[in-house]
Amino acid sequence: MFIKVLGSAAGGGFPQWNCNCANCQGLRDGTIQAAPRTQSSIIVSDNGKEWVLCNASPDISQQIAHTPELNKAGVLRGTHIGGIILTDSQIDHTTGLLSLREGCPHQVWCTPEVHEDLSTGFPVFTMLRHWNGGLVHHPIAPQQPFTVDACPDLQFTAVPIASNAPPYSPYRDRPLPGHNVALFIENRRNGQTLFYAPGLGEPDEALLPWLQKADCLLIDGTVWQDDELQAAGVGRNTGRDMGHLALGDEHGMMALLASLPAKRKILIHINNTNPILNEQSPQRQALTQQGIEVSWDGMAITLQDTAC
């Protein structure tokens, strides 16, 4: 299985365009050791030629321009994106669909709850009908495996997770199970497995078996501490309010990852306020000591022989 991180930051990217927090200002003036990041999105493949896009970031055009694997040579117009899967209806995971309109129709897999949000509150499915058929919806049901024709050896399973619906949704603060899913991806030919969850608010007993059997975890690293935005003076929401489990809390994401057997544990969807973006910070060193990696834009991951 081949995975490439197109974008590794949370909403707004890093540095965020209007932010002068310690991280954003430090990156701009060169006083911290850090790398710019675009908003969260990945591609996966069973052969390294045809790809499935998992979430469509607002930065998708820039990301595709820096990903030669997606450029389809020998045709006047084309792409190696063979399908799109959405894990939620958040702005930073769906706005990129608008930038892909010239390539419509696109085959899009998402839950009915996500499709409802994207047909009403943020109606990209409705808007894009005017571009060559727009987005063709393939409903996915929790824990019901499905495949995408472009990558037939990969089996995808949507696993409901505790998080939140987007601020524009009428289901904000009262999400249904289909509003947020992780993806458990298995290569049916050799058993390689990836668990992808860019937004995870609270792991529960039903989720643990999926986490425990994954060879590789690509998982929510949004904030270090739950009140991080408040402490930085840039917002009032906590990590939990936004549907994200803080890394550094006593029973947070880092503690959870330490208990899991995956050979690689990689963080994605990292907020611009998170101190782990500073590669010399104590928080980053704590992750390194636990064997936890921090993804970056363009990071390539290859899973071979049931191991990462």
UniProtKB/Swiss-Prot annotation:
- The superkingdom of the source organism is Bacteria
Q: Which organism is it from?
A: Klebsiella pneumoniae subsp. pneumoniae (strain ATCC 700721 / MGH 78578)
Q: State whether keyword Transport applies.
A: yes
In terms of InterPro entries, this protein maps to: Metallo-B-lactamas, PQQ_synth_PqqB, RibonucZ/Hydroxyglut_hydro
Q: Which PANTHER family match?
A: COENZYME PQQ SYNTHESIS PROTEIN B, HYDROLASE C777.06C-RELATED-RELATED
Q: What does this protein do?
A: May be involved in the transport of PQQ or its precursor to the periplasm.
Query: Protein name, please?
Result: Coenzyme PQQ synthesis protein B
Its encoding gene is what?
A: pqqB
The text of the family note is:
Belongs to the PqqB family.
Query: Record's SUPFAM superfamilies?
Result: Metallo-hydrolase/oxidoreductase (SSF56281)
